[in-house]
Design a protein with these regions (language model features):
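Sec-dependent bacterial lipoprotein signal peptides
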Residues: 1-19
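Bacterial Sec-dependent N-terminal signal peptides
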Residues: 16-39, 376-378
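Short alpha-helical segments and helix-capping/turn motifs at coil-helix boundaries
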Residues: 26-29, 53-73, 121-133, 199-200, ...
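Terminal, contiguous helix-loop blocks that mediate binding/assembly
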Residues: 28-30, 133, 157-406
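Cell-envelope and extracellular/periplasmic
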Residues: 34-62, 66, 87-91, 114-115, ...
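Loop/turn elements at helix/coil->beta-strand transitions in domains of secreted/extracellular proteins
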Residues: 38-41, 76-82, 136-141, 184-189, ...
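Glycan-recognition patch characteristic of GH18 chitinases/ENGases
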Residues: 45, 56-122
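Catalytic-core segments of thiol-dependent peptidases
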Residues: 87-108, 116-183, 194-195, 200, ...
Length: 406
């Protein structure tokens, strides 16, 4: 009987041990440990799952991602982090750390997520907060890759304007602003690797989110930023924004021929500007004086002769300098005062002689371009575009309600 009891007891102990081992086998995965603080963390936010009609965007972004890996070869990894939030078609959303192990650059998936809309400001805020927690730094940068088109309100229509495109949904610039406040301090820079984002309305709306904003006033080249050249500039301290913009421009300028690109390098040009946020309130103040003095009724505003950046039906982006000079004349003293402030705000600007528009499928001249766009109001007071425009901080700061829609 005692022997039987011993056998039963031994069996129970063995069963308990096996159960414990199985419990350990199915425990929740161990969360990664936060990395120690570095000089700078840059979060590249890729929104490539735009729906079946735009699946080629994910293919372009996968090339961009590989170029980011190449760019990290030339970076001191002990002082920086390059983190990528990737939302591509035929893949789960994931947060990736591009790191160096010895001389090798590797992509380490830190987190994967259930399906979520990356253009929901709560999702974007959560990704930012997670990045800040696990990859703390003394300063931060943000890169946005997707479709976009300036400040216009979000819409459910495919290929309509605003910021980003996820399965034919978009994000308002005001929601984008709120999400970026999840960073613990203003960003060192925001790079918009997406179309038509170097607009004064966008820059002014985000002026408390970043020291510098980098982007194009018109459509960007299909391949996007040359990240093997641009990534090293993310982590420099002096003239960071200008060096990012210059690296972006110079690669395309090298290949520029003024012809429509086929296979091989993009030869159809590029334009890129960097804007200093701390000067934008002065630009708004001076622009409000110009508008108050020079603008009469809404119907008198003219677009003829001013550089056009936006070739869609919205027709929402024209050259800011060209608009102001058309109101005052370049010989006017007020214009010269305004232009001094404008030049202080636009710290870098460069363009090839022509750029390409995929909307009209041809090259167009950039000879009257100065790098920063503006909306020239037209149409009914209560049109969707004008109603949304009046909610933007730039519209309020320059007094359009008092001057035009009075």
């Amino acid at each position: 009987m005692n022997k039987l009891r011993m056998v039963c007891l031994s069996f129970l102990v063995l069963l308990l041990m096996v159960s414990c081992n199985h419990a350990e086998e199915y425990e929740e995965p161990v969360l990664p440990q936060p990395r120690g603080q570095v000089e700078r963390t840059v979060l590249a936010y890729i929104v490539g799952d735009c729906g079946n009609s735009f699946s080629e965007l994910s293919d372009l972004f996968r090339v961009n991602f590989q170029d980011m890996l190449k760019g990290m070869r030339h970076v001191d990894y002990s002082k920086c982090n390059l983190i990528v939030y990737s939302e591509m078609d035929n893949d789960v959303p994931r947060l990736i750390s591009i790191k160096k192990i010895g001389e090798r650059v590797v992509a380490d998936t830190v987190f994967t997520y259930e399906e979520q809309n990356p253009l929901d400001k709560r999702v974007m805020s959560s990704v930012i907060s997670q990045t800040v927690h696990y990859f703390p730094a003394k300063s931060y940068g943000f890169v946005f890759l997707s479709h976009s088109a300036s400040w216009l309100p979000a819409s459910q229509k495919p290929n309509v304007r605003s910021l980003g495109m996820y399965r034919k949904t978009q994000m308002d610039i005001t929601d984008f602003h709120d999400a970026l406040l999840s960073f613990p301090e203003p960003l060192k820079f925001i790079l918009f690797d997406s179309c038509l984002m170097q607009a004064v309305e966008v820059a002014y709306e985000l002026r408390d989110c970043a020291d510098f904003l980098i982007g194009s006033p018109t459509e960007i080249p299909g391949p996007g930023a040359p990240y093997d050249k641009v990534v090293p500039a993310f982590f420099v301290e002096k003239d960071c924004a200008s060096r990012i913009a210059s690296a972006y421009f110079e690669e395309y300028n090298y290949w520029y021929t003024g012809s429509i690109s086929g296979r091989g390098p993009w030869r159809s040009g590029v334009s890129i500007a960097a804007v200093k946020s701390s000067v934008l309130h002065l630009l708004a103040d001076k622009t409000s004086i110009v508008y108050a003095q020079a603008i009469g009724e809404l119907g008198r505003l003219q677009k003829e002769g001013i550089q056009r950046y936006d070739w869609s039906d919205d027709d929402a982006n024209y050259d800011l300098n060209g608009f102001v000079s058309s109101l005052l004349g370049e010989g006017d003293e007020l214009y010269r005062e305004w232009k001094t402030v404008f030049d202080d705000a636009v710290v870098y600007w460069n363009t090839t002689p022509q750029n390409y528009s995929g909307l009209i499928r041809r090259l167009f001249s950039m000879d009257k371009a100065h790098g920063l766009s503006v909306y020239i109001p037209e149409g009914a007071y209560n049109s969707p575009m004008n109603s949304f425009y009046r909610t933007l901080q730039w519209s309020k700061a320059v007094g359009l309600d008092r001057i035009i829609w009075k």
